[in-house]
UniProtKB/Swiss-Prot annotation:
Disruption phenotype: RNAi-mediated knockdown in embryos is semi-lethal, with half of the mutants dying prior to gastrulation and display numerous vacuoles. Escaper embryos die at the third instar larval or early pupal stages, displaying black necrotic plaques. It comes from the Eukaryota. This is Krueppel-like factor luna. It is found in: Nucleus. SUPFAM superfamilies: beta-beta-alpha zinc fingers. Residues 474-483 have a biased composition (Basic and acidic residues). GO terms for molecular function: DNA-binding transcription factor activity, RNA polymerase II-specific; RNA polymerase II cis-regulatory region sequence-specific DNA binding; sequence-specific DNA binding; zinc ion binding. Probable transcription factor that is required for cell differentiation. Essential for proper separation of the sister chromatids during early nuclear division cycles in the syncytial pre-blastoderm embryo. Residues 269-286, 335-371, 424-447 have a biased composition (Low complexity).
Length: 570
């Protein structure tokens, strides 16, 4: 046991040498640890010294010295005990240099970060449950070809008059993964003017549409070929995480493809032809109305996408995270040529297309790009977007564009949507014949609640269109899930999720071992990973006890100690 040197130990050794036995008289060295423990308990509640005083008491080896009489008897001339042999009568290995003379040397230790195995089958259930209620729909099938600069202003691009739409049901397999498809149901239109807007409703016909506007899109470098309707379009938009969050480095290398607006115009032209056929069928079936005639005629746009086996579960969750409200300006659609004829227009019979919202993907008509075009894997599977008229009638002029989910393009970028206002649609044209009043009245009554909701939303969006848009203003979204920012720890095997980026950074220091907070007390070298730990440690130097019991006079330096003490009063 290491003890402070004194003359008693040498007198005890002398007594053993002369008498041959050791006296059982206790000394302070025998109970040194117990004495220090009792003194520490006794002095624990005493006031602490505010400033460290430097004196000769810091090094006790300089105070005590070996008695000269003992050195003479042992025939030791040197004052250093290090030169004494272990075979001498005084078998002592004490060394004065073995102690740290200046007291500044600190202990060193190594920290081992444990890495756990990733369980790929286990998923974050909390995030998926919250995101499952959101509508996933690719914006590629219903948006024109906007070209936007870095400032976020949309500029309509030139639109050609010819379009090529081929009908195919493309399915592909890779590594045993089944392919997914996204269907888009478009309703017929009589005309599409510059004052009309486009809305999209969800799979449920009762869900109201939301006015949205496409903000920004990029081209893949080197892709000068024309993008057909079967391609996907992503938007380059700010992420949901602040720049201080570790997820902010995922915004690099994000490209997007453009969808030309004349493809949409060709689809509208095709639906107009189907509308004329349905009006003739309604006149023939006035006495025997079918349930499918209560809604406007629709057609399915199917985009088949091969699921990417290399995409991780975290990237798939980030894809599902970016749900916002967009709005397409009517100026981008006003230049599209409605009178262009599609050379390859193909769909199933118009009588069956009205029931496509409740049918499976195999029973619906599909319109996709040419078969030689590459298949993109960032289209969500089983996604349906329904294009309906503003008032539910086939002769309405404006269609509206509802909720769209932005998907990530390269698997390493978080794509989030940007809110904008939408212009109110122009006056609708009522071209329904008086002979088909029995059947068209049902469709008008069915779409009346949806028309009221759409008109209310269009007024709100028109009022907010004059406000300048900021990239970080996505918190004004009406959806509660869109307001919630989710910051997930990206270390291997860790599934911690935080709502604040500062909490996530404090948690990540447990993985890295970083301790940026250093104690400023003189002579103290303690460092901490969190600021509250430093504050708690600093109270040990100052002796501050800010937490006082309201039932008695006791004070505590930590709140958890006060909480334990409060249980005694209960």
């Amino acid at each position: 046991m290491d003890i402070l040197p004194s003359g008693n130990i040498f007198s005890e050794l002398e007594r053993i040498c002369t008498t041959g036995y050791y006296s059982s008289q206790p000394s302070i060295e025998d109970q040194w640890q117990q004495t220090c423990y009792e003194l520490e308990r006794y002095l624990r509640d005493e006031p602490k010294l505010q400033k460290k005083m430097h004196s000769n008491l810091d090094n006790p080896w300089d105070i005590f010295s070996t008695p000269a009489r003992l050195l003479e008897e042992l025939k030791i001339k040197e004052q250093h005990l290090d030169t004494i042999s272990t075979t001498s009568s005084v078998s002592s290995n004490c060394s004065g240099t073995s102690w740290d003379s200046n007291g500044s040397q600190a202990l060193s230790c190594s920290v081992l970060v444990k890495q756990e195995r990733i369980d790929e089958e286990d998923d974050d259930v909390g995030c998926d449950d919250k995101l499952s209620v959101l509508l996933a729909a690719p914006p590629s099938a219903i948006s024109p070809n906007p070209s936007i600069g870095s400032a976020g202003n949309m500029t309509p691009t030139s639109i050609s008059n010819s379009s090529s739409i081929s009908s195919s049901n493309s399915h592909s397999n890779s590594n045993g993964n089944t392919t997914g498809s996204s269907n888009i149901i478009a309703s017929p239109l009589s005309s599409l003017g510059s004052g009309s807007t486009i809305t999209v409703s969800s799979r449920n016909s009762s869900a109201p549409g939301i006015k949205v506007r496409v903000v920004q899109a990029k081209n893949h470098p080197g892709s000068n070929a024309r993008m057909h309707l079967g391609h996907v379009q992503d938007f380059v938009l700010p992420t949901l995480t602040p720049p201080s969050s570790p997820e902010s480095n995922l915004r690099s290398h994000n490209y997007a493809q453009q969808l030309e607006a004349n493809d949409l115009a060709a689809l509208i032209q095709q639906q107009q032809q189907q509308q004329q056929q349905q009006q003739q069928q309604q006149q023939q079936q006035q006495l025997n109305p079918q349930p499918g005639n209560s809604t406007p005629a629709t057609a399915i746009l199917r985009f088949t996408s091969q699921s990417n086996p290399t995409m991780t579960q975290l990237q798939q969750q980030q894809q599902q995270l970016a749900v916002q409200h967009l709005s397409i300006s009517p100026q981008a659609l006003g230049h599209s040529n409605i009178g262009s004829n599609s050379p390859k227009s193909s769909s199933s019979s118009s009588s069956n297309s009205s029931n496509s919202s409740s049918s499976s993907h195999s029973s619906s008509s599909s319109i996709s790009g040419s078969s030689d075009q590459p298949t993109h894997s960032n289209i969500p599977r089983s996604t349906i977007v329904r294009l309906t008229t503003a008032n539910g009638k086939p002769g309405a002029a404006g269609i509206s564009l509802a909720r769209v989910i932005q998907m990530q393009n390269n698997g390493n970028a978080n794509v989030a949507a940007v809110l904008s206002a939408a212009a109110n649609s122009g006056s609708s044209n009522s071209n329904s014949n008086s002979s088909s009043s029995n059947t068209s009245s049902n469709s008008i009554n069915t779409a009346t609640p949806q028309q009221q909701v759409l008109s209310q939303r269009s007024e709100k969006s028109a009022n907010g269109s004059s406000k300048p848009h900021h990239p970080r203003q996505h918190h004004s979204d009406h959806s509660p899930d869109a307001k919630r920012r989710i910051h997930k720890c990206q270390f291997l095997g860790c599934k911690k999720v935080y709502t604040k980026s500062s909490h996530l950074k404090a948690h990540q220091r447990t993985h890295t071992g970083e301790k940026p907070y250093k104690c400023s007390w003189e002579g103290c070298e303690w460092r901490f990973a969190r600021s509250d730990e430093l504050t708690r440690h600093y109270r040990k130097h100052t002796g501050a006890k800010p937490f006082k019991c309201r039932n008695c006079d006791r004070c505590f330096s930590r709140s958890d100690h006060l909480a334990l003490h409060m249980k005694r009063h209960m």
